Every structure is written in structure tokens, then in C-alpha cells.
Amino acid sequence: MEERQDQKVIRINLLQVSMTLGTYLGIYITLVYLVTAMTVKYANLTLIAIPMILGIPVVAYMLIRHFRDENCKPFFPFPVSWIITILTFLFATALSCMVAYLYLRFIDHGAFAAGLMEHLEIMIQTFQAEAQTFTDPAQLEQYDKAMELMRQSVTWFCSLPASGVTKQLIQSSLMWGNILSLIIALITAKKLRIK
């Protein structure tokens, strides 16, 4: 009976730790989403947004490593590390995607999509001026196909309602969270050293 209670306490602690770490990571990812959304209006913010996006795995690693070091145990097995990491990404995804949905639904009112379409048109005009220098018809045809595919993709993305964009964010966040959780768990796991 005691063993079951101890296991239950451990599971609750894992969930509590994952929720806490997921909240911190979710706040960081929310800031990344907001800075990325602002890059449509202020292009110079791209210099901040790209390092912030690349910093998501680093922040997740630092959070898990901090928990591992504060745990004060010499043994932090891979399964425990992986469960904490994957649950951290799950809770971070829930928080950040909820905030992204609220932003897109009630604050943005289509400004993000309009900004994307405006940037797409500027890019296409710039590339068309460059394409006039092409002499190879095959290269020109390949360029036209690529531009049309880009236009269709951006138009499709901009036509999504806030719930559709949020579903895309959830899917991509969970996919990348699963991949990153395996890598981070491998790095943060500690084996028991037998002396």
C-alpha cells in the first residue's frame, strides 16, 4: 500500500514540476510568437525573433537541467527526464497556443494576414525584377512555379481563421516538442555511477 502511495506522490510531483516548467517555457514561447507577429509590421524585429526561435530548445534544456540539479539526486534516469521534458512541452504548447488564439481572434483582426500578403507582393515584385535577367527558359519556368507555389501557400495560410492557425501552431509545437524532448532528455539524463 505504501509503495502505491509513494508512486502516486512521484507522479503528482512530476506533473507539478512539468506544469511549472511548462508555464515558464510557455511564457517564453508566447513572447516568441508575439515578436514574430510584430515582424510583419516592423521588419527589424526579425533580428530579435530568429535568435528567440532558435533559443527555445536552449531555454527548455536550461529549465530541465535546473530541475535536475535542484533535485539533488545522483540518479536522473532517461525515462523520468523524457517524461518531464515532454510534459513541459505539452503544457508550454497549451499556454502559448491559447494566448496566440486570443491574440489572433480578439486583438489582431487580420492585420497579421494582411501584413504577410503585403510582404509577399513586395518579394514577388523584387524577384520579378531579378527574373528579367534570366536567359534560360527552364530556369524562368522553375522560378514562376516556385513563386506561384509560394503565393498559394501564403494565401491559404492567410485564409485560415484564428482557430485554424491555432491548430497549425498546436500541431507544429507538439511535433517539435516531441523531437526536442528526446534530445533534451538524452542530454539531461544522469546514470547511477557504481563505485
How would you describe each model-predicted region?
Residues 61, 65, 101, 105, ...:
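Short helix-terminus and kink motifs of transmembrane alpha helices
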Residues 69-90:
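Alpha-helical transmembrane segments with an aromatic anchor "belt"
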Residues 1-72:
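Transmembrane alpha-helical insertion/packing segments
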Residues 99-137:
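Functional transmembrane-helix hotspots
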Residues 143-176:
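Individual transmembrane alpha-helix segments
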Residues 24-32, 55-56, 92-100, 176, ...:
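Alpha-helical transmembrane segments of multipass membrane proteins
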Residues 69, 180-195:
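Juxtamembrane interface at the cytosolic side of transmembrane helices
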